[in-house]
């Protein structure tokens, strides 16, 4: 656990699963993380993705979305993304994945906590029903190459280089 807090009437328990890049666990730590992520008793999952290597993180996101859709994606290190001359279209990413996407800066710890709290509120306020499996189902991850290709395609569609941004200047 990295923290328990309260936001209004909502009790929030955050569990950190660092270094988890796939639900196909290869260590005991990854198995524990996977089981917590896929636990149908959990009210939702916030996946914190490193914006500087979005494609790798999208593999885990896509695997999780095969198991449940009560997910919020938090793209972290957006300041580092900008330093590299890149941008991430979080609105487009949200549309593609069908879940909320928020972003945070690596240098602003208070803002990170606030954005994570906002992500939890978005989970609790979402209308409609959530779909969840009854736990981890390895059959949903039979084709890792397909998931990796999908992650690559999504990343290519939402990561924008500075020189690819739309030029809205008026030419005289």
Task: Report each predicted region and the residues it spans.
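Switch II (G3) loop of P-loop NTPases
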Residues: 11-28, 51
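Canonical P-loop GTPase G-domain recognition
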Residues: 79-132
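Conserved C-terminal guanine-recognition region of P-loop GTPase G domains, centered on the G4
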Residues: 3-9, 31-102
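Conserved RecA-like P-loop NTPase ATPase core
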Residues: 16, 33, 172
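Short, membrane-interfacial amphipathic segments enriched in basic
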Residues: 156-170
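Extended, hydrophilic extramembrane loops/domains of integral membrane proteins
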Residues: 118-125, 140-160
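Short hinge/gating elements
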Residues: 18, 135-139
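Helical mechanochemical/support elements of P-loop NTPase systems and associated helical scaffolds
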Residues: 13, 25, 29-32, 56-60, ...
């Amino acid at each position: 656990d990295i923290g328990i807090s309260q936001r209004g009437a909502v009790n929030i328990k955050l569990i950190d699963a660092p270094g988890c890049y796939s639900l196909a666990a290869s260590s005991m730590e990854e198995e524990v993380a996977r089981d917590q992520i896929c636990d149908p008793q959990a009210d939702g999952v916030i996946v914190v993705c490193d914006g500087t290597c979005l494609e790798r993180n999208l593999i885990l996101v896509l695997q999780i979305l095969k198991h449940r859709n009560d997910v919020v994606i938090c793209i972290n290190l957006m300041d580092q993304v900008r330093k590299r001359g890149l941008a991430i279209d979080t609105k487009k990413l949200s549309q593609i994945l069908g879940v909320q996407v928020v972003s945070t800066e690596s240098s602003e710890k208070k803002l990170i906590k606030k954005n994570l709290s906002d992500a939890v509120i978005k989970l609790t306020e979402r209308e409609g029903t959530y779909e969840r499996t009854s736990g981890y189902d390895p059959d949903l991850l039979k084709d890792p190459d397909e998931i990796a290709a999908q992650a690559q395609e999504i990343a290519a569609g939402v990561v924008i280089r500075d020189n690819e941004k739309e030029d809205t200047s008026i030419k005289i």
